[in-house]
Amino acid sequence: MPPPPHIKPENVLKRAQELIAVGQAPAALNVLHEHVTSKRTRSSPIVSLEPVMLLFVELCVDLRKGKAAKDGLYQYKNIAQNTNVATIEVVLKKFIELAEKKVTEAQAKADEIQSSLESAAPSSNVEDLEAIETPETILLATVSGEQSRDRTDRAVVTPWLKFLWETYRTVLEILKNNARLEVMYQTTALQAFQFCLKYTRKTEFRRLCELLRNHVQNAAKYSAQMHAINLSDPDTLQRHLDTRFQQLNVAVELELWQEAFRSIEDIHTLLSLSKRPAKNVMMANYYEKLARIFLVSENYLFHAAAWSRYYNLLRQSAATLAAGQGTKKENPSVTDADMTKAVSFVLLSALAIPVISTSRSRGALVDVDEVRKNKNTRLTNLLGMAQSPTRAVLFKDALNKGLLKRARPEIRDLYNILEVDFHPLSICKKITPILKQIGADPEMEKYVVPLQQVILTRLFQQLSQVYESVSLKFVYELAQFPDPFQVTPAMIEKFIMNGCKKGDLAIRVDHISGVLTFDTDVFSSAKALHSGSAAGSAESEVGSVQRMQNTPAEIARLQLTRLAKTLHVSCMYVDPSYHEARLQAKQAAQTRAAAGAAKEHEETLARRVIIDKKKEAATDALQRKQREEETRKRIRTQQLQEAEKQRLLDEQREREKKRIKDEQDRIREQELKKQIEELKSGVKGIDLSEVDLKDLDANRLRAMKLAQLEKEKNELNDRIRTTGKRIDHLERAFRREELKHIPADYEAQKKRDMELYEALKAETLKEAEDKHKEAVALKHRLSRLVPVFNNFRKEVSEKRHEEFERRRKAAERDFEAKKKQRIKEVQDRRRRERAEREEAERRQKEEEERIKREEEERAAKEEERRRVLAEEKAKREEERKKLDEIALKQKQREEEAEARRASRKTGFPEPPARAEPERTAPRLNLAPRTGGGPSWRERQAAKEAAGGAAPEPAKEEPAAQPPRRTGGYVPPHLRGASAAAPAAPPSNGAAPSRYVPPSARDSGSSTPPSRTQTPATTSEEPKSAGKWVPRWKQQQGQ
């Protein structure tokens, strides 16, 4: 069954509009809230649900129902974030716009109420929007009867301001840590900052900063969730940086310096996570705000360092723009006036750094060095510096960059007076016009007080070097400043006491005699003598103080140093060898340094190469790790998406099952109600008031109905039986009494029936006569129309017959035409089929002929290939025969050489060498004797065989070959000669006992041929196989 009509969003929207039209806005909001938060809404289409949400947020704003709006918007985000993100942004923007509109209307209403008053800052006296009504305000409202502007704003504007603040916070909570909604999140955060700035909401700004900070912290904690933001993404990180910079600007505008410093820390944390460098315009804003924060916190050292970093950034941006490597959007626009101003502030802030620490603290005896070190490390990291700044380093950096030339004249003169040419007696006269110029500038006026501290420090340092005691009046006269910046004696004494408490000054004040006494103890610590070296000082360089002359304490303290120097010079004059040894050692060290410079340079280059390789390997490993991480993250994201899809499918199935079950329960309940109503209306006496409908079912109702019917039937039978007994007696009495009156009643009945019959008969006859007369008259009246009717019927019949004949002939013509057409189609079809069949047979025949022709061509090609192979084989046979003849000649020459060697061994004379005639017969392959060299008869027979014609080949069987050797060298021309003949032992059964030449080991029989035996021709020589055969294969073939 389809769902109930009220479940559809269109019906809910229509119902809510109807309720709004009759003035029932809360009821309409409840209807919309129930529909939005219902589980059935998840399956509704977003297109139809968006108008419902727009009306829902509008009612929530009108009725100031922030909690209901939060619940509905959370539910709507969960429904639409996987399908359509734009609709979430539309609804949330509408929500914020309506809340802002209500605040504007409330302000206009308050202005109308208090038109005579002007307000520069609405609701400025309300410190906390979440704690508006305090006991004081309630008492004031009770006692006071006048209507002030503050009370009007508190009653009219402040509730809507509170609702607008709740709106921003709700929207930020809904959009947090969602990568698909982070643009809307940033926009809402910027709007919330503007809200705090416009209405001067400092408390809400602190809560907003903490809320955003918690969101960023939770982003790393819940990074594995679906649609979680990734701070490694440059675009996401840039959006958060933009938000934090706006937060920093608003904090500075509201003068919330603690929140501004925490914003600085947030920005520094995000910058450390960023892979791309920040824009120069953003960093310029960063250093400018940081300098203002340090100035407010009276940390003049890091304030000057921030100004130095700011100036370096401006100079870098100017150089980048001049080189055309950057854009004006990414780099701050810098003019000569801006550069001069920045340089002046760099020098002025460096001059304002206290030489000694004069702030109120527990003194140098407390162990606070570790805390100060950690604090300085944090501030140094915020400035992006490698080491903590110092006063001397800042001045050195400024002088190296030539900032004095670009600074304003009064700042340049102030530097010369304080750091170059400081004279305690004329310092105040020289510096008075400069302080007046600085005090006239509102931005530089803040540096007058720290400059006074520096001047006093320099003054007492110089006085301590010249005087042992001075009068207080003299000191007061020296420390005279211009009129707006005068220093009272109390302030001077306070300065002295703080310096002495820190251990940076060693001064005693005698108010009775009015004298200032400087500590002249010879054995006093060097800390009191060298201001700025203490733990609480802002400066640790002793040389920064101008030394006019040494004090007695310094003379006593440096006595050993002077004595050591004097003795060293005396030794150099008394013992020249000592000086020469020092010079030789120095020269040897220089020689060693020069000799090892090249090697050290090579080692440095090699180390640099190794470092580069390690860097490349580390970079590759990092990139590989990043790729693997991205792959794992992508796989994890896919798994999460699949899990989310599976979860949504499971939820949808569960919702469908629940819907079907609810529908079945609803139908069953309706059926039960219907059956109960039928049971109540159909069966009397049944009571269902105490029966629970949840426990009922159809079977139980049927059983109850049957039981009640059985009960009613039994009661009816009892009543019938009782009534029957009673009626039997009455009926018997009634019938006995009737028997007396039946005859008279029968006669009266017959009489009444006869009278009634006669009346009905007369009436029937009269009606029949009247109808007959009317029919006769009608017949006479219509008889005149009979000829006309017959003619008309005849005409109609003839026309219809003609029409029938015409249609029948047309049908016959159509039938004949269609019959001919059908015959023609059949003939064409048969003709076409015959042609197709003949074409198929022709194609088949052509295909068979083509296959046959291809087979013939293939056979011809195969025959040609075989012929070519045969020719090539014949050529190879001829070449192999030639090679065999060459081998035989070589073999003959080897045998002759062997025979000559054998003859030399046995003592026979070597036959004379003669030119061999050209042989026409093949060389004989005669095996030598086994007992020794060839005999004379054998050599003569060989000569005759070589000189005569080749005899006929022998017809007898070849002799058995000697057993083949399993090892040793085998000539190439004999490796395949005897492969076909099996090995056999010698005919006489004895192994040869004499040396057998290699050429005759495997050829012929073991016994020498007979002197009368005809040698074999070359045709009987074993033919070479034409290719090399391995020895193991030869042995296997044997």
Curated annotation (Swiss-Prot):
- What domain of life does the UniProt record list for this protein's source? Eukaryota
Chief location? cytoplasm
Task: Give start-end ranges for the coiled-coil region(s).
Answer: 92-121, 611-899
**Residue spans with biased composition (Low complexity)?**
943-952, 976-993
Respond yes or no to whether keyword Cytoplasm is given for this record: yes
Region: Disordered, residue numbers: 621-641, 800-1038
- In Pfam terms, one family for this protein is eIF3a_PCI_TPR-like
Entry GO terms, CC: cytoplasmic stress granule; eukaryotic 43S preinitiation complex; eukaryotic 48S preinitiation complex; eukaryotic translation initiation factor 3 complex, eIF3e; eukaryotic translation initiation factor 3 complex, eIF3m; multi-eIF complex
Transmembrane ranges? none
Location comes to:
Cytoplasm
Task: Mention one GO molecular function.
Answer: mRNA binding
User: What are the alphabetically sorted keywords of the record?
Assistant: Coiled coil, Cytoplasm, Initiation factor, Protein biosynthesis, RNA-binding
The answer to whether the entry has keyword Cytoplasm is yes
PCI domain location is: 339-523
Q: Compositional bias of type Basic and acidic residues: which residue ranges?
A: 621-632, 800-901
Q: Where is the composition biased (Polar residues)?
A: 1002-1019
- Which family does the UniProt entry place this protein in? Belongs to the eIF-3 subunit A family.
Under the heading PANTHER family, the entry gives:
EUKARYOTIC TRANSLATION INITIATION FACTOR 3 SUBUNIT A, EUKARYOTIC TRANSLATION INITIATION FACTOR 3, THETA SUBUNIT
Q: How does it assemble?
A: Component of the eukaryotic translation initiation factor 3 (eIF-3) complex.
Role summary: RNA-binding component of the eukaryotic translation initiation factor 3 (eIF-3) complex, which is involved in protein synthesis of a specialized repertoire of mRNAs and, together with other initiation factors, stimulates binding of mRNA and methionyl-tRNAi to the 40S ribosome. The eIF-3 complex specifically targets and initiates translation of a subset of mRNAs involved in cell proliferation.
Full protein name: Eukaryotic translation initiation factor 3 subunit A
In its UniProt entry, the species of origin is given as Aspergillus oryzae (strain ATCC 42149 / RIB 40) (Yellow koji mold)
